[in-house]
């Protein structure tokens, strides 16, 4: 909701997003803020049931969540900030169960950031023409000349983080065997078939990351 409020004027100028509730005026900014405050209250009530370390770390995610929508105005790396924010739950889940932070969740978290960086770059290519006109920045624009190399790099870092996590957790060979499935999917299906000039193809491949 915060993202839609922040991007209201931008969304009006982009064909794909102009019908979003706040951009189209179906929901007012005031009502959007009420929804946001309500959701934050419920989230806080849930959070207070966890240990102190989890609560402190969770509160640290708030500045990330509220500053992310502004990043596309100032940097070509808003997708990186999305990854940092979106995957924060990996850290929280570990701390909630173990009551401390460790190397393993940090490695997994770092890898997941690059996964998000990759698939949201694909997502961004849907609007790249409109974004360039209105002045929005993104990794899609920054790497538009050779996006596949960038995506391969992001996904390689992600898969490497999973392998490293498996080694540190002493997983058996089945983990690495099943890891071939997402590896094949990311490299041979997503990146290989990615057509950054076709918005429908971009959205189709982006959605494949829900596996």
Predicted features by range, described:
Residues 20-107, 186-196:
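Intramembrane alpha-helical segments
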Residues 7, 28, 78, 127, ...:
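Residue-level signal for inorganic ion chemistry
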Residues 8-58, 133-176, 180:
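Multi-pass membrane catalytic core of lipid/isoprenoid biosynthesis enzymes
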Residues 2, 6, 117-136:
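Membrane-embedded alpha-helices of multi-pass transport/permease systems
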Residues 104-115, 172-179:
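Alpha-helical transmembrane segments
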Residues 74, 99-106, 117, 121, ...:
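Short, structured loop/turn "capping" segments at alpha-beta junctions
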Residues 3, 61, 65-69, 111-116, ...:
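Alpha-helical transmembrane segments of multi-pass membrane proteins
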Residues 160, 164-211:
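Extended hydrophobic alpha-helices typical of membrane-associated regions
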